[in-house]
């Protein structure tokens, strides 16, 4: 798709009747959006076909003119898709580029297409259609990522690993349980996507510049033809609204935050010091100087790209925050933010899905790490509550003394002699050792949503039925 950036002055703009001369070259440059909004060509043509069809149905244009318009628009669509369309910066945007080419192809009938329509509702339609399609794509990609985590969770429902708080060993959990935490996160992201699709499922076409139109149009007809639930209800709000774009960016930013947290864990877990996972060669790179290196670049790039998404959200919020109602040219700056964020999110989800599916999990290393750092200390405290009748705060204090003793002796809690434990509290018996293994700790956490393998499998079944 070629782009003509010739800087000669022109007075052939579609709005040029009121002007005696063409715009300055700098004005053309700052005013033009064709460099990025050409991405909307399919939505623009689809909307124009629906609009022309409605105009003919309502008797506003002739069926003959409608047929010429539709044929011409389909020709333009083929030209753009095949790379044989020359975009012109002097024509500003995708709407004017398409209309100018249509005039060349079919003559005066092209001038009837813009009846009862403004670029204000036209761009709102194109952009809304594009965001709706992108949300649908995001929903599918999140479903794939959730499926990847469900598979790993099922595979590792009993694989013990350390659970962390403050990145310090806390309690044993299973890797399957940890995977299911991300299923919950990305499930919420997908739910937000679905709600966003519902929110934007209204057709803006027919709002015209801001006040509606005096032509007897049928907005319900175009809404149905374009796959919307219904038309928007207020023409001023229709051309003012970019909530749908901001909501997309907010959803992308939240999903990006989840992806970034996952990326951070993968980066940490893949270090030799942790050694919990090993990324496949397909999602790793090497060093130009250090032959031994296998770097988690895919995870690091996911972590970085999510920062770009945050920037896009803040940029569009800032663009929109001071605008009076209806259309202002500031709103032209909305699309690049959304396009860039959408591309970043797609790449991040795709890369993370591949990493999760392909990575090798070192269950032996995880289990060994789970047994360090006194991870079963809470189990000792709980045993004292259940078996010795201590209040939890007293049990917490007794356990803290046991941890301090084990630390001073360089051993784990389960390795302390019974005499040492009884010296701390006389109610402790040899039965306490039954709860001090990581396997026993994990198996005991049977509360709803807990880390016990039986609970993890219930949650997997729940999500399998909904994915």
UniProtKB/Swiss-Prot annotation:
InterPro entries, A to Z = Arg_succ_lyase_C, Argininosuccinate_lyase, Fumarase/histidase_N, Fumarate_lyase_CS, Fumarate_lyase_fam, Fumarate_lyase_N, L-Aspartase-like
Query: Which processes are annotated in GO (biological process)?
Result: arginine biosynthetic process via ornithine; L-arginine biosynthetic process
This protein's pathway reads: Amino-acid biosynthesis; L-arginine biosynthesis; L-arginine from L-ornithine and carbamoyl phosphate: step 3/3
Which domain of life does the protein's organism represent? Bacteria
Tell me which stretches of the chain form a coiled coil: none
Q: Where in the cell is it found?
A: Cytoplasm
Q: Which Pfam families does this UniProt record tie to the protein?
A: ASL_C2 (PF14698), Lyase_1 (PF00206)
Q: What is the protein name given in its UniProt record?
A: Argininosuccinate lyase
Task: Give the chief site where it resides.
Answer: cytoplasm
Q: Which UniProt keywords apply?
A: Amino-acid biosynthesis, Arginine biosynthesis, Cytoplasm, Lyase
**GO MF:** argininosuccinate lyase activity
Query: Which NCBIfam families does UniProt cross-reference here?
Result: argH
Q: Which GO terms describe its cellular component?
A: cytosol
Which SUPFAM superfamilies has this protein been placed in? L-aspartase-like (SSF48557)
Give the family from UniProt: Belongs to the lyase 1 family. Argininosuccinate lyase subfamily.
Q: Which reactions is this enzyme annotated as catalysing?
A: 2-(N(omega)-L-arginino)succinate = fumarate + L-arginine
Q: What is the lineage of its organism?
A: Bacteria, Pseudomonadati, Pseudomonadota, Alphaproteobacteria, Hyphomicrobiales
Q: Which cysteines are joined by disulfide bonds?
A: none
Q: What is its EC number?
A: 4.3.2.1
Q: Which HAMAP family match?
A: Arg_succ_lyase
């Amino acid at each position: 798709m070629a782009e003509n950036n010739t800087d000669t002055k022109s007075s052939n703009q579609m709005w040029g009747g009121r002007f005696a001369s063409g715009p300055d070259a700098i004005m053309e440059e700052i005013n033009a959006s064709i460099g990025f909004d050409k991405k909307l060509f399919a939505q623009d043509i689809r909307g124009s076909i629906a609009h022309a069809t409605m105009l003919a149905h309502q008797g506003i244009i002739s069926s003959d003119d409608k047929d010429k318009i539709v044929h011409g628009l389909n020709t333009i669509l083929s030209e753009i898709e095949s790379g044989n369309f020359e975009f012109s910066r002097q024509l500003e945007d995708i709407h004017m580029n398409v209309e100018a080419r249509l005039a060349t192809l079919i003559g005066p009938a092209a001038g009837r297409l813009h009846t009862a329509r403004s670029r204000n509702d036209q761009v709102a339609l194109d952009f809304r259609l594009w965001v709706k399609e992108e949300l649908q794509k995001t929903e599918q990609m999140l479903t794939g990522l959730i499926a990847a985590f469900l598979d790993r969770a099922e595979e590792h429902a009993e694989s013990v690993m350390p659970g962390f708080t403050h990145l310090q060993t806390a309690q044993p959990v299973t890797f399957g349980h940890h995977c299911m935490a991300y299923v919950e996160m990305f499930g919420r992201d997908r739910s937000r996507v679905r709600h966003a699709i519902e929110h934007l499922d209204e057709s803006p076409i027919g709002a015209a510049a801001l006040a509606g139109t005096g032509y007897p149009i049928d907005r319900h007809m175009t809404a149905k033809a374009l796959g919307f639930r219904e038309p928007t209800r207020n023409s001023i709000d229709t051309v003012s609204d970019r909530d749908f774009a901001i909501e997309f960016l907010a959803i992308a930013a939240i999903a990006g935050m989840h992806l970034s947290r996952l990326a951070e864990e993968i980066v940490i877990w893949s270090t030799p010091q942790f050694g919990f996972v090993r990324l496949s060669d397909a999602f790793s790179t090497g060093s130009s100087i250090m032959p031994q290196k296998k770097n988690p670049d895919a995870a690091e790039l996911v972590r970085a790209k999510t920062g770009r998404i945050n920037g896009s959200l803040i940029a569009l919020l800032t663009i929109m925050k001071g605008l009076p109602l209806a259309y202002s040219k500031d709103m032209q700056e909305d699309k690049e933010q959304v396009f860039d964020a959408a591309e970043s999110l797609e790449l991040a989800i795709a890369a993370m899905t591949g990493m999760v599916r392909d990575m090798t999990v070192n269950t032996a290393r995880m289990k060994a790490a789970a047994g360090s750092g006194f991870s079963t200390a809470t189990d000792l405290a709980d045993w004292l509550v259940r078996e010795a009748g201590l209040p939890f705060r007293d049990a917490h204090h007794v356990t803290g003394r046991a941890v301090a003793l084990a630390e001073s002796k360089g051993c784990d809690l389960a390795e302390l002699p019974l005499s040492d434990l009884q010296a701390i509290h006389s109610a402790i018996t040899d039965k306490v050792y039954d709860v001090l293994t990581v396997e026993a700790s994990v198996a005991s956490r049977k509360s709803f949503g807990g880390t016990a393998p039986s609970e993890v499998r219930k949650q997997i079944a729940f999500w399998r039925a909904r994915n």
